[in-house]
Structures are given as structure tokens and as C-alpha cells.
Amino acid sequence: MQQEERGSRKVKKGIVVSNKMQKTVVVKVERTFAHPQYGKIVTRGKKYYAHNESGDLQIGDEVKIMETRPLSKLKRWRVVA
């Protein structure tokens, strides 16, 4: 059997908005884009639940998260930096 190459995992940069859970943080990732009709620059955000083994992150910290296998019902990301 031949091993299949795994595709590159997605990496996103965001800010920690909650650290109240054990080994889990909520990271808000913002993206900006031009509105298709009006051309105005619009900012949209999305929250991701990420695994944080060390538990040393504080609210407001800037982190990188990487896609991973499902760790729970909501967690599909882990903190890498």
C-alpha cells in the first residue's frame, strides 16, 4: 500500500477572546474584503474553538491556529504560536 500525501493544513491568525475553558480558547479571526457592488472595505469576523494544551494564553493575545482532526464537537483547530 502506498501512503497518500496529506494536503497542507490551513493556518489562521487571530485574537483570543475567551479562555474560560480548560485547554480550550476561542479565537476571533477577522478578514477584510471589498464589497462587490460598492467597493467599500468591509471587515467580517468568525470565532474558532482551538485546543491549547498549555493553558497559558490570556484574552487579547495574538495567536496562530492550525487545522487538525476533530478533537470534540466544536474543536477542529489547535494553537501553534
Swiss-Prot record:
Single annotated GO MF: rRNA binding
UniProt-listed PROSITE patterns: RIBOSOMAL_S17
UniProt keyword annotation of Ribosomal protein present: yes
Cysteine pairs bridged by disulfides in the record: none
Organism domain of life: Bacteria
Residues in the signal sequence: none
Pfam families: Ribosomal_S17
InterPro entries: NA-bd_OB-fold, Ribosomal_uS17, Ribosomal_uS17_bact/chlr, Ribosomal_uS17_CS
Keywords: Ribonucleoprotein, Ribosomal protein, RNA-binding, rRNA-binding
UniProt record, GO biological process: translation
Entry's Gene Ontology cellular component terms: cytosolic small ribosomal subunit
Job description of the protein: One of the primary rRNA binding proteins, it binds specifically to the 5'-end of 16S ribosomal RNA.
Assembly and oligomerization: Part of the 30S ribosomal subunit.
HAMAP family, A to Z: Ribosomal_uS17_B
Family of the protein in this entry: Belongs to the universal ribosomal protein uS17 family.
Protein name (Swiss-Prot/TrEMBL): Small ribosomal subunit protein uS17
Gene transcribed to yield this protein: rpsQ
